[in-house]
UniProtKB/Swiss-Prot annotation:
Belongs to the ArgR family. The keyword NADP does not apply. It comes from the Bacteria. Regulates arginine biosynthesis genes. HAMAP family: Arg_repressor (MF_00173). Pathway: Amino-acid biosynthesis; L-arginine biosynthesis [regulation]. Its main location: cytoplasm. This is Arginine repressor. GO terms for molecular function: arginine binding; DNA binding; DNA-binding transcription factor activity. Keywords: Amino-acid biosynthesis, Arginine biosynthesis, Cytoplasm, DNA-binding, Repressor, Transcription, Transcription regulation. Gene3D superfamilies: 3.30.1360.40, Winged helix-like DNA-binding domain superfamily/Winged helix DNA-binding domain. It is found in: Cytoplasm.
Length: 148
């Protein structure tokens, strides 16, 4: 089946009922005849701008449209999913709960903070690149306050 068909199936499954994990979503896709790996599903989730909130995975605006007002709030996702921040010169490594790095990185990216050049999200880790060490320290302190 095509990528387009898989994306439609993902949207439909998430709209139908709460999905708590990527593995649960992957199993539901397999039952529908899609041969999908965790890596492919991770890319699909990123491309569809799906985020993981307290109730499970959700589509932006509930229908897959990309509208900034419907993105998760950085304070909400950081306090829910952020665990710790480690600084390495001008870079920060933000450790999150499993499966939560994508929505955290998305929320940080959309804050448009001058301390952030860009983010790179894995499954439970976000790499944040800052322009210099001083701004990395400022951002680390801000994120640690949000995490609590």
């Amino acid at each position: 089946m095509s990528k387009h068909e898989r994306h439609n199936a993902i949207r439909e499954l998430i709209a139908q009922r709460p999905i708590a994990s990527q593995d649960e979503l992957r199993r539901k896709l397999v039952r529908r005849g899609f041969d999908v790996t965790q890596a492919t599903l991770s890319r699909d989730i990123h491309e569809l701008r799906i985020y993981k909130g307290p109730g499970g995975y959700a589509l932006p605006n509930g229908n897959g449209h990309d509208e900034q007002d419907d993105l998760p709030d950085v304070d909400e996702v950081m306090s829910s999913f952020g665990l710790k921040v480690k600084q390495a010169q001008n870079q920060l490594v933000l450790v999150t709960t499993a499966g939560s790095a994508q929505p955290v990185a998305l929320a940080i990216d959309h804050e448009d903070w001058p301390e952030v050049v860009g983010t790179l999200a894995g499954d439970d880790t976000v790499l944040i690149i800052c322009p210099d060490q001083k701004r990395a320290t400022v951002l680390a302190e801000r994120l640690e306050k949000i995490i609590g």
